[in-house]
Amino acid sequence: MNPFLKLVRIHNVIGAGLGAFTGYVASSMWKIDPTELILAVLVVALVDAGGNAINDVYDVEIDRINKPDRPIPSGAVSLRTATSLSYGLMGVGVILSALQGYLQFLVALLTSVALIFYARDLKRTGIYGNLVVATATALSLFYGGLSYHEGDWLQRIWIPVLYTFLLTLSREIVKGIEDYRGDLANHVNTLATTRGIASAWRVARVALIITEVTSPLPLFLGYNILYGIVLVPFLYITTKAVLAETSEEGASKARSLLKGSAFLGMVAFALGSLPFQFLFHYLP
């Protein structure tokens, strides 16, 4: 893979862009303004790419030991280039957000600042770092909805934003459990290293169960039957994550499952937002 694509974690960038797309179509019910949608996806993708790059900048010393094949420690990308690229990407994203409005600009700016502080200070603070990542990820969908910003957009977007927050929070806690031994050796404070694996698992499971129990709610708030159809595999995969073994190995399995849950969640809200007249038009 190209070292710059690896540096920005291109798969995460694509996921963030899809989040913005989902947020826009969910809040607008597919009443798409192509310019606003493209800007929303670009802003979110650029800010996410910059945040991922700055994360590697501040992790360079740890990566020299744990992940020497990452672009900076391997020498494929210099530290100076990576730093300039990260700030440049976030800067372009923030500038583009100003074209959409002051609220969009404010969200993009604050998210960029939060990602910098996360990489520099908050990543090793345990639950606080997890909360920052979960909030930033949920804001991808929120930003998409904000880019539409008409009618009852907020009523339609708050549930997918909340579910994204809870799923991401669970995944970040589970990732801390998976990395327990390495984090303990490197004095990294995570929920698992400070409170124990069992306690960390308990918090992650509570967040997932809240998501599962309330997941039918969108069907009563205007989302169509396609949401319910996609909800079935979502619940199956998420339940498997909840029931994973309370161990580092179980955490590794759960983290992979939760990536699938996140993707299915976006699909559910995107398809569930299609207006009925659109669905009936394509029925035989």
UniProtKB/Swiss-Prot annotation:
Any GO BP: glycerophospholipid biosynthetic process
Membrane topology: Multi-pass membrane protein
Alphabetically ordered keywords of this record: Cell membrane, Lipid biosynthesis, Lipid metabolism, Magnesium, Membrane, Phospholipid biosynthesis, Phospholipid metabolism, Transferase, Transmembrane, Transmembrane helix
GO CC terms in record: plasma membrane
Catalytic activity annotation: sn-3-O-(geranylgeranyl)glycerol 1-phosphate + (2E,6E,10E)-geranylgeranyl diphosphate = 2,3-bis-O-(geranylgeranyl)-sn-glycerol 1-phosphate + diphosphate
Alphabetical list of InterPro entries matching this protein: DGGGP_synth, Prenyltransferase_related, UbiA_prenyltransferase, UbiA_sf
EC top class named in words: transferase
Gene3D superfamilies according to UniProt: UbiA prenyltransferase (1.10.357.140)
EC number, as in UniProt: 2.5.1.42
MF terms in GO: geranylgeranylglycerol-phosphate geranylgeranyltransferase activity; magnesium ion binding
Membrane-spanning residues: 10-30, 37-57, 76-98, 102-119, 126-146, 217-237, 260-280
Subcellular location: Cell membrane
Cofactor: Mg(2+)
Pathway info: Membrane lipid metabolism; glycerophospholipid metabolism
Major location (coarse): membrane
Described purpose of this protein according to its UniProt entry: Prenyltransferase that catalyzes the transfer of the geranylgeranyl moiety of geranylgeranyl diphosphate (GGPP) to the C2 hydroxyl of (S)-3-O-geranylgeranylglyceryl phosphate (GGGP). This reaction is the second ether-bond-formation step in the biosynthesis of archaeal membrane lipids.
Protein family membership: Belongs to the UbiA prenyltransferase family. DGGGP synthase subfamily.
Name of the protein described by the UniProt record: Digeranylgeranylglyceryl phosphate synthase
Annotated source species: Metallosphaera sedula (strain ATCC 51363 / DSM 5348 / JCM 9185 / NBRC 15509 / TH2)
